[in-house]
Amino acid sequence: CLQAAENADINILTRVVDYGGIFLGTMKPDHKFRDGDHRTYRPSGWVEEGLSRVDKMRSIIDKYDLSELHFSCLWNLSHAPVRSVVPTFIQEAGDDAKPIEDLVREYGSLPIESPFSQAEVDEIAAIGDNTGCMMLKGASNRHAESLRPDEWPMRPELMELADRHGLGSEW
């Protein structure tokens, strides 16, 4: 998708660059979420799996003396069509959680340029590849009809568009 966007001269804003809070630096295994937090609907063990992947990226994070939030933002910005990044600021539960104001200040001090080499960008992508970990929302071949507001059948014209840009058909 990134290559298709670049080929079409489309700029991208990536959101949730903190990956559900994993890169905010405050989550621990067995993280306790506030009542009503939408992340509780994710598959069991996602926090632990995410944190294990962050640990595998630690040498690159430390090499550049980055916070986890800066690391995730800069990795996203390392991709040519990505021009802006937006984390999700959520006040986590617990006395040891970072105040949301501190997270906003940290985000505001983001370095302007990514320090990563292409080899590091590729290494981070390989470590973080979570293809197939959750059902994607939106248009998909999985849906024959719209049973939920965030899932709907893939229309033929969307498949034609995906094919034209080399995006495949396995959605």
Task: Locate predicted features.
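Structured C-terminal cap/extension of enzyme domains
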Residues: 3-171
